[in-house]
Design a protein with these regions (language model features):
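C-terminal motif of bacterial Sec signal peptides marking the signal peptidase cleavage site
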Residues: 26-27
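Soluble, non-transmembrane catalytic domains of enzymes that act on hydrophobic metabolites at membranes
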Residues: 57-61, 72, 172-177
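N-terminal "domain-start" segment that seeds a small globular fold
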Residues: 31-59, 78-79
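Thiol-/selenol-based redox modules, centered on thioredoxin-like
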Residues: 145, 153-186
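Structural microenvironment flanking redox-active thiols in thiol-disulfide oxidoreductases
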Residues: 77-126
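Bacterial N-terminal signal peptides that target proteins for export
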Residues: 3-17
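Short active-site neighborhood of thiol/selenol oxidoreductases, capturing the structured segment around
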Residues: 61-81
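Short, internal strand/loop/helix patches
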Residues: 100-102, 116-152
Length: 186
């Protein structure tokens, strides 16, 4: 019994050491800028995948209608995103506008991205929601600077003019009834 316990400990320690070294290695990969900076009042082109594993470029792939982009930075922002989208959809804005949510995550490495995408995909079964959720792995500081986003404490939303990357209006936090009226006026 003593020998088998020692053997188990001997076999488990190298596995733990390997996992520790592996995760330290992947977490230290250099960050790459995965978007192009836009001009003033322009939303930068950012690449990502929706939760159906389709590559998308925001806003370039959504030019047939005005586009509402809701940008989130923290996992707990999902409730704020959902409230905003519920307000938009209950007022049939999804018929006249493309509405997407863009969770932004600091660029790490492909293995981490695959894992995080899988976790998000597993939690969302609705194909419509999977299609409109485009995860962007990018340099968050540069992204925030380009869009004059001061911090990651809340969500930020942008109304983009049809066929362009021009920001018509933008706001922060849950979209309110008053902001909805402003969006509808464009």
């Amino acid at each position: 019994i003593h020998k088998s316990k020692t053997l188990r400990q001997f076999l488990v320690r190298p596995k733990l050491l390997f996992l520790l070294v592996f995760f330290l290695t992947i977490s230290c990969q250099p960050s790459k800028n995965m978007y192009m900076s836009g001009e003033t009042n322009e939303f930068p082109s950012i690449e990502g995948n929706n939760l159906n594993k389709e590559k998308k470029v925001v806003p370039d792939d959504f030019v047939d209608k005005d586009l509402i982009i809701i940008v989130a930075f923290q996992q707990w922002h999902q409730g704020l995103v959902d409230q905003s989208i519920n307000l938009l959809e209950s007022n049939e804005m999804d018929l006249t506008h493309n509405i997407i949510e863009v969770p932004t995550i600091r660029k790490t490495n492909k293995l981490n991205e695959i894992y995080l995408d899988g976790v998000m995909r597993a939690g969302i079964r609705d194909d419509r929601i999977r299609n409109r959720t485009i995860t962007a792995y990018l340099n968050k500081e540069e992204f925030k600077e380009d869009l004059d986003i001061p911090n990651e404490e809340t969500i930020y939303w942008f109304l983009i003019e049809e066929g362009t990357s021009k920001i018509l209006i933008q706001g922060e936090g849950i979209i309110t009834e008053k902001e909805l009226e402003l969006i509808q006026s464009y």
